[in-house]
């Protein structure tokens, strides 16, 4: 163990990171299809590389106009991110866009449309009719580190990434380019964040910018200082933080020209920054019949309400499904010794308050809507800039009554 305390690190990336471009494209296609046909079945994967975007996957939808417009949807999202010139390494207006999308497998569709409970067990409840779109395990987490009940390292990393994009788009630092990454290392003592140890900020920039005289001081003042001034954390000492700005030197070649990108390759950035476990399934480009996405959202909803209800200071919940079955095959609750009541009672209360069948999750969180594109960057959880249904604290009183 370090003499400075236990050090934990999380990272975030900006919306111009190649993998995040892909997440954004996939979710923009999803939203367009859901807007026209809320029952669309969508599994869209995107790959970007120098001058090229490839969009592939499986879609079943009645949204014919939106489907036919996918190429324009792709271009508009890339331009919105900020890749609008070959000088920046990528141009959404002129890049090649290749579409290779088929229909959802009928073998998968039968298990989603008519769950095992309805087909085999004779269940009459309409919520037993929709089965899980795949087997798998999903985790949710909440902790009282921050007002949004997220681990502090990932919350701070996301704030820095959002600020990087903000100062680029609003013209405060117009020489910045869309690609960028942030990393935050925090010292903990007895599970309490006590000191901001290291911040790494790497950002793409115009070629004629002096790193020492311009970029470094600008990033410290306009990005780091602004974020830390707004943080106002009770226990965190940020007075002696080590700051590394573009530690490799210049970062001119970025975006898809610097690295190929793929949908679903930033799943730790998307969730809890490595602080909590992950079931392995990515989110972007998937409609809510895919429990990789909808059940992970439901688990965050569960965990956040448990902590907000004062049942534990931190909690991790796991749910698991079998493909084609509505009811989960397992639920697991871990409170890490922070519980205020018996964890067995917490698990029982969760089962009473939350219906974790896929159809019920979709109903209760109102997921058949075009709400996913904003989640493609800066995290799916703990967002303070977007109203997301799985972040609402609407089950606190129900949990307290159930206990």
Swiss-Prot record:
K(+) binds at residue 45. Binds 2 divalent ions per subunit. The keyword Transferase applies. It comes from the Bacteria. One of its GO terms (biological process) is S-adenosylmethionine biosynthetic process. GO terms for molecular function: ATP binding; magnesium ion binding; methionine adenosyltransferase activity. This is S-adenosylmethionine synthase. Belongs to the AdoMet synthase family. Catalyzes the formation of S-adenosylmethionine (AdoMet) from methionine and ATP. The overall synthetic reaction is composed of two sequential steps, AdoMet formation and the subsequent tripolyphosphate hydrolysis which occurs prior to release of AdoMet from the enzyme. Its main location: cytoplasm. Keywords: ATP-binding, Cytoplasm, Magnesium, Metal-binding, Nucleotide-binding, One-carbon metabolism, Potassium, Transferase. It comes from Mycobacterium marinum (strain ATCC BAA-535 / M). Its EC number is 2.5.1.6. Pathway: Amino-acid biosynthesis; S-adenosyl-L-methionine biosynthesis; S-adenosyl-L-methionine from L-methionine: step 1/1. InterPro entries: ADOMET_SYNTHASE_CS (IPR022631), S-AdoMet_synt_C (IPR022630), S-AdoMet_synt_central (IPR022629), S-AdoMet_synt_N (IPR022628), S-AdoMet_synthetase (IPR002133), S-AdoMet_synthetase_sfam (IPR022636). Homotetramer; dimer of dimers. It catalyses: L-methionine + ATP + H2O = S-adenosyl-L-methionine + phosphate + diphosphate. Disulfide bonds: none annotated. It is found in: Cytoplasm. ATP binds at residues 17, 179-181, 250-251, 259, 265-266, 282, 286.
